[in-house]
Each structure stands twice: as structure tokens, then as C-alpha cells.
Amino acid sequence: MSNVTHQPKIGFVSLGCPKNLVDSERILTELRTEGYDVVPHYDDADMVIVNTCGFIDSAVQESLEAIGEALNENGKVIVTGCLGAKEDQIREVHPKVLEITGPHSYEQVLQHVHHYVPKPKHNPFLSLVPEQGVKLTPRHYAYLKISEGCNHRCTFCIIPSMRGDLVSRPIGDVLSEAKRLVDAGVKEILVISQDTSAYGVDVKHRTGFHNGEPMKTSMVSLCEQLSKLGVWTRLHYVYPYPHVDDVIPLMAEGKILPYLDIPLQHASPRILKLMKRPGSVDRQLARIKQWREICPELTLRSTFIVGFPGETEEDFQMLLDFLKEARLDRVGCFKYSPVEGAGANELPDQVPEEVKEERWNRFMQLQQQISAERLQEKVGREILVIVDEVDEEGAIGRSMADAPEIDGAVYLNGETNVKPGDIVRVKVENADEYDLWGSRV
């Protein structure tokens, strides 16, 4: 055990998705509350915590490299997060790691920190910890995690083996956190989980309470309540359950942002079956048409995988045909990558890397054309934009159709009389495949 006499300092690195970022924020909030100083450099820290990602092989490699860097520069390292669920894999590469915990093991992480770097007796930081906790996002937006884990067993994914089955947070707790965020100046709440539309399924949508008011534990009920906070609410990771239809009217009424992040993964019924995903493409196209009729402003984001084991040229052509018909606004595409422990590894007919690359290029070329056409439709229109950055050359923001980090931006060249978090009306003057340019009205 270290004999720490100065103010203890903890180095911290957070890797992976927004869900992991929320876990990091929770750990950092506890550390700050207990009086630890969190520092950006490893060399003068008493210990380093690495919150890892283990979703795909490249993420595993990045996590292992970050652990190695922390060991080289500091020597005392605790590992947590998704890759922490595979302790043997970490120990094989980095046997000198002090402790390893799995994802959302907040208490264990803190116990290990206390063991190696005891808590300070005097806490000069307690009054500096904001009520909403430590946030790693800009002040004007924040991620709101509503559940942990997932009940699906998609064959390309190992999240359930790392994070377990679905566990929904009590709706009262979620809404209390959202209220604290808004009170602290947050203008945009990004609702996240492994499976947002499954919120409440594990507790059979039981009645919860917030400020003494009863409400159902469900995605639709949660959206209704969040809409009362008067800020932008954006839904991510929405599995295409039938009840997703029920949130579209809320978007049409302006209660939550007309934005749906709904990972569809493929469009060939045969490949979807191999993935253990919903397989009715015609039904999905009909739903998209219906959603747009109800809410013409709706932005649809999705992600797809090309080169999944067994994918033929015919299967891939079905995917391209789907893109042409669905005309989705925002699309991400991944080349299938084997993940240790995933069921898809056992499937026959693995697709050669050069074929994956060729299909990915064709996919992206088509979707870029669709995206450019969709954005061109906005030229000449007025839209609302939330400002993210301002410098001497102007401002950069996002429209209601743009989530942070993953979507496009709106450039306001020469506009310096705004600040991050401002929501301004903008006339769109130009567009390319991903971004817009405009002037404040």
C-alpha cells in the first residue's frame, strides 16, 4: 500500500462508446467527491485507471495499447470496462496490471483505488464537484444512460457476455438525473443504452414514480416526461420493436427531436437470420414510409455490416436496393470483423477481406450520393442549430438531424457573436455529402 501524504492524483483514460463515457463520468465523480485529484498526465499520478472497450478487435487492440502506455509511464494501473470481462486476455499481455474489473463495477474500482492510494483525510474538492457530477462532454450536452446490458443475442456481438442482460434504471432516477443536467445548463440530452427501446422490459414496465407522480417504466413514457424539460432530447440505439411507432407522434409534435438512431445491420432476410436480427425488410420499409408521413422532418440514422459470414453478392445487392428505397439520412457501415466469443465466428463461408473492402466502398459511394441529395433538399430552408464551437473564423454547430461525434455539422462562417450551447435559427446556403453551411437569420 502506498504511503500518500500529498493530495492523491489519479490519471484516467476513457475509451469506447458513449455508454462507456457515462461509466467513466460516474467513477470520476466519485473520485472527485472523495477528494482525489484527476490529472491528464500519467507521470505525476499516483495511479492510472483505464476504462476499456472490447467490442471489436480494433477496440481491444486500442485498449491493450492504452494499458501498456499507462504501465510504461506510471506502473500502477487498474483496468475496468468491457475488456475487463476478459481478465485472462489482459493478464496475458500485461501481467503487471494491479487489478481488473468488468464493466459498470464502480464500487470495485473505488475499493481498489482506496487500497493502493488511500483517501485523503481532508477533501478540498467536495465543494467543487457539480451537482450533476463530473462530465466529459461539453457543458451544453450530456449522455443519459437509461439501462445496462441487453437481452438480444446477435451473433456478431458479445456485449451481453460483458455487460449482462438488460437492467433498466428506475424511471424516477433517470428523470432526476435529467433534471439535474438541465439545471446545470445542458441544452441537449442524448438518451443511450445497449437497447433503448427495451427500456422497462425487464421489470415488465412496472409503475415508477418521479416527484410523487406515477408513470410507466417504458421508452414512450420516458420520452413524454423528458419532453417537459424544455431541451433537445435525442434517442440512440433504438432496436426496431413495434412500439417504436409510438414515439414518432411525439417527434411530430416537437416533444422530442425528430431523430431516430435505429441499427438495422442488413437487408437480406437470410443474413439477418444468421445475425439473429429482425428479418422483414418489406415491413421495415413500410414502417419508414409511415414514420415519414407522420413526421416529415424525421431524420433516420442506421448502421450496417457488410461482409458478414455467408454474405453473397445477391445478399449485398439486396442491401444496396434497400438503401436506394429507404433513402436514410445518416448511415454508418462496418466491415465485418470477427470478435472473440461471438457466435458468427462459427459460421461457414467467411468473406475474404478484399471482397469486404470492395463492398464497403460500393456501399459508401451509394450512401454518399443519397446523403448529398437529402442534404441538398435543405438548401434555402431555415433550421435550428445548436452551437458547439466558436473561434475567430466563425461557429460550428449541429442541426436537429446531427448527433455529436457521429453525424455532420453546420458551419456558420464569420458568425462569432454566439457561444457554445446557443440555439440559433440558420438559413442553409450550401451542402455537401455530410455537412451544411449557412448564415444566422
Curated annotation (Swiss-Prot):
Location of the protein in the cell: Cytoplasm
Keywords, in A-Z order: 4Fe-4S, Cytoplasm, Iron, Iron-sulfur, Metal-binding, S-adenosyl-L-methionine, Transferase
SMART domains the record matches: Elp3
GO process annotations (BP): tRNA modification
Cofactor(s) the protein requires to work: [4Fe-4S] cluster
Role summary: Catalyzes the methylthiolation of an aspartic acid residue of ribosomal protein uS12.
UniProt xrefs under HAMAP family: MTTase_RimO
Designated name of the protein: Ribosomal protein uS12 methylthiotransferase RimO
Naturally occurring in which organism (per UniProt): Salmonella typhi
